[in-house]
Amino acid sequence: NFIHGLPHYCISIALMERGVITQALIFDPNRNELFTATRGRGAFLNDRRIRASKRFRLEDSLLGTGFPFRRHQDEDAYLTVLRPLVDKGAIMRRSGSAALDLAYVATGRFDAFFELGLKPWDVAAGSLLVTEAGGLVGDFDGEANYLDGGQMLAGNPKLFSILVPLLQPVLGSGVQPAAPAATDAAPAPRRQLRARSRAAAPERGAAEDDRH
């Protein structure tokens, strides 16, 4: 986006202490919007408290996502999972910035977000923003392995529980991208909610400009 002059990019910084993300900052210089979060103290946009949306039906929701930008990169799996979402009436947008998409989930502009092939610096700050805004984050299996696994699903609790069973059989960690989906149904919602709400991660920091 930045290279092509499209005004949708950001600076995304997260602080990780002892494997836990404790501080997050995402700055959009084009709109002068500063998203911040401190673990246990809420999420804010330009010092105003923000919350995830409360929409609970896919047909009323706006979802952010990211399509493969390299040829043949999981394209069959993406196309397979898009059909049930479209059939259920979900409206989707691809903005090109995973970090801003997560900030938009935190502020309720997007109701949910999902994408494959992400790096820790794409999602570290945004994951804390979402959880501090009352949302949930995880991988497509409903687990907390989103930093190392490259999968990110974020949204309000209701939509999260709806999207996991749709994404997991096609894009879950146990599915090989080039093979037919073969995993079982998603885990029980109770176990998902416990795992997703943690901002756990490996023992390393994450601070990078968002170039996704």
Map each language-model feature to its residues.
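Glycine/serine-rich anion-binding loops at beta->alpha junctions
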Residues: 1-10
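Acidic, metal-binding active-site segment of PIN/NYN-like and related structure-specific nucleases
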Residues: 134-151
